[in-house]
């Protein structure tokens, strides 16, 4: 029998500061991958994480 998909999905978090900031250490955008539980957090995830491109802790938002 086939198993159901489950509640945990893999998501990508992207730095919001890298998109708008022109004065950064290196080109590109900082991204993290993590898992979230669909039932506990149905809306988009936002976490403060370290961005190696900006060299500081910034807000990372979930992207599709």
UniProtKB/Swiss-Prot annotation:
Cysteine-cysteine disulfides: none
Subcellular locations according to the entry: Plastid, Chloroplast
Family annotation (InterPro entries): Ribosomal_bL33 (IPR001705), Ribosomal_bL33_CS (IPR018264), Ribosomal_bL33_sf (IPR038584), Ribosomal_zn-bd (IPR011332)
GO terms under cellular component: chloroplast; ribonucleoprotein complex; ribosome
Chief place where the protein resides: plastid
Keywords of the record: Chloroplast, Plastid, Ribonucleoprotein, Ribosomal protein
Domain of life: Eukaryota
Gene3D superfamilies: Ribosomal protein L33
Pfam families in alphabetical order: Ribosomal_L33
GO molecular function, one term: structural constituent of ribosome
GO biological processes: translation
Record-stated family: Belongs to the bacterial ribosomal protein bL33 family.
Name this protein carries in UniProt: Large ribosomal subunit protein bL33c
């Amino acid at each position: 029998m086939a198993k159901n998909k489950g509640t945990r999905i893999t998501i990508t978090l992207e730095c919001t500061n890298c998109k708008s900031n022109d004065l950064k250490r290196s080109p590109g955008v900082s991204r993290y991958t993590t898992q979230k539980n669909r039932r506990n957090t149905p809306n988009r995830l936002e976490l403060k994480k370290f961005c190696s491109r900006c060299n500081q802790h910034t807000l990372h938002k979930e992207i599709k």
